[in-house]
Amino acid sequence: MMCGFTSNPSPKKLLSKSSATNVHLEISPVKPDRPCKGYENVLGSCTTVAKCADLTDDLPVHNKENLLHGFNDLERHHDEENSSLQDSGYSSILQNDSPCQDETDSNVSDIQVRDTPKNLMQYQKPFHTLSTRCLPILRFEAAMCSTLKKMRKTSKKIDWNAVDDVVCGGNYGLEHLIGKSMGLERVDILAELFHRDFKHLLTKILRHLNAMDLINVIGVSTTWRKILQKDNWAYNTYKLGCKELCEKRAKVSTHTATRDESLCRVPLASVQKVAASSLCTSKKQNKNGGLSNNRHAEFIEVAQTLKNDQSLKACVDCGSPAKYDSYLHRAICTRESCKLDFCTLCSCKYHSSKSCLISKPRSYRIPIEPLPGSKKSKQNLRRL
C-alpha cells in the first residue's frame, strides 16, 4: 500500500530535475505531472500539498520564458538553503535551529497535522447525529448510565427500585424494538400487529382465510375476536359461514336439543325443546318396534334348525336366539359375533361337571318342637 505523504524534495534533486526539463523543453514540450489515483482517497477531505510541489498550476506549459523565470527563483531559494542545510529529506523537518524553519513549518504542519488520524476524526461528522439520538435504545442507555453514575457516587449498592422507576417512567419506545420476542416458544403475531396498529397487514392476512377458518379464529382469544370484528369484510363472511353451518346441521339433525350441537341459539329455544322431546320419543318407539320384528324373524329362522331335544332361549348378553339343551341346562348363542356358551341356571359360563351354586338343594330347617295345631301336638296333648 502506497503512503500519501510527500516530503519536501532536496534542492539538489530539484536542480537536477530542472536542468533535465530545460534540456527536454528545447526539443518538445513537457506534459504536466498528474497525482496518483489513490492519493485523494488516502487524504480524504485534506487536499493541501506543499507550496513548491507543482510549478505548472499558475504558469502555462508552453511559455518558455515563464518556465525559465520559475527555475531562476528555485535557484535563489536553493542558494539560501545551502547556507544553513547540508542534507535533504526528513532532517529539514526535524531540525529546530535552522533560520528557515518558520517558512518550512507552515508547509510541513499543513501536511503532518491534517494527515494524523486524530485530526482526521475532527473533520468527520460525530457518530451520534440527530437520527441516532432518536433511537430508543440509545436514549435508554444514556438514561440508565446517568442514573447508575449518580447512584455510584452516593452508595456502592445498586437501588433497583430507582432503576425500575427510570424504566417505567421514561417514554423510550422500547416496545417498538425489533427482536424483543426472540427466544420465546410462542409468539402471538396477530396480537402484536394489532397492538402496533398494523391494520393493513391484518386485512391482508384475513383475506386469505375462508369462513370456517374465521369461525375458528374468533374462538381463540378476545384480541382475535376484536381483530375480526373491526374488519367488516371478515366479520360479514364469518356471519354468513355461521348461518350456512347452522342450516347444514339442521338438515342433518332435525332437533337441536343440546347447546353443544347448536352453534347459534334462536329466541324460541324452549318451544324447540318441547317439539324435540316428542320427536325423540316417537323415534324410540319406532326403533323398538322395528327391533322386535327383526328379533322375531331371527327366532323363527333358528327354530327351523332345532333338534327334538332342543329348544330356544334368549342370550344373556345380546338377546339373540340360543339353542337350549334341557338335560344339560346348557345354551349356545347362534349369533356369530357372540357365540356365548352359558348355563341356564346361574347365567354364567358353562361349567360342565361342576355343581351349580343355584342348583344346590335347599337345606330346610327342621323344627325341634311341633307346631301348634299340628297332628304331633294333638297326639302329645292326648298322651298327657
Curated annotation (Swiss-Prot):
Q: Does the keyword Transcription regulation apply?
A: no
Instruction: Read off the InterPro entries from this record.
Output: F-box-like_dom_sf, F-box_dom, FBX5_43, ZF_ZBR
Q: Where does Zn(2+) 2 bind?
A: C343, C346, H351, C356
Compositional bias annotation for Polar residues = 83-99
Region entry Disordered, spans:
1-20, 79-106
UniProt keyword annotation of Cytoplasm present: yes
Residue spans crossing the bilayer: none
Per the record, the major location class is nucleus
| Residues that bind Zn(2+) 1 | C315, C318, C333, C338
Q: Which UniProt keywords apply?
A: Cell cycle, Cell division, Cytoplasm, Cytoskeleton, Metal-binding, Mitosis, Nucleus, Ubl conjugation pathway, Zinc, Zinc-finger
- Report what the Swiss-Prot or TrEMBL entry states about this protein's PTMs: Proteolysed; proteolysis is induced by both cyclin B-cdk1 and cyclin A-cdk1/2 complex through probable phosphorylation. Proteolysis is inhibited by pin1 during G2.
Protein's pathway: Protein modification; protein ubiquitination
Q: Which domain of life is it from?
A: Eukaryota
ZnF locations on chain (ZBR-type)? 311-359
List where Low complexity composition bias occurs.
9-19
GO BP terms, alphabetized: cell division; negative regulation of exit from meiosis; negative regulation of meiotic nuclear division; negative regulation of mitotic metaphase/anaphase transition; negative regulation of ubiquitin protein ligase activity; protein ubiquitination; regulation of cell cycle; regulation of mitotic nuclear division
Span of domain F-box: 191-238
Location comes to:
Nucleus; Cytoplasm; Cytoplasm, Cytoskeleton, Spindle; Cytoplasm, Cytoskeleton, Microtubule organizing center, Centrosome
Gene Ontology molecular functions: ubiquitin ligase inhibitor activity; zinc ion binding
UniProt comment concerning the protein's domains: The C-terminal region is required for APC inhibition.
Summarize the protein's role: Regulates progression through early mitosis by inhibiting the anaphase promoting complex/cyclosome (APC). Binds to the APC activators cdc20 to prevent APC activation. Can also bind directly to the APC to inhibit substrate-binding. Required to arrest unfertilized eggs at metaphase of meiosis II, by preventing their release from metaphase of meiosis II, through inhibition of APC-dependent cyclin B destruction leading to stabilization of cyclin B-cdk1 complex activity.
The family database entries (PANTHER family) matched by this protein are listed as: F-BOX ONLY PROTEIN 5, F-BOX ONLY PROTEIN 5 AND 43
Quaternary structure note: Part of a SCF (SKP1-cullin-F-box) protein ligase complex. Interacts with btrc. Interacts with skp1. Interacts with cdc20. Interacts with pin1; stabilizes fbxo5 by preventing its association with btrc in an isomerization-dependent pathway; this interaction is present during G2 phase and prevents fbxo5 degradation. Interacts with plk1.
Q: Tell me the protein's name.
A: F-box only protein 5-B
- UniProt organism field: Xenopus laevis
Q: Which gene encodes it?
A: fbxo5-b
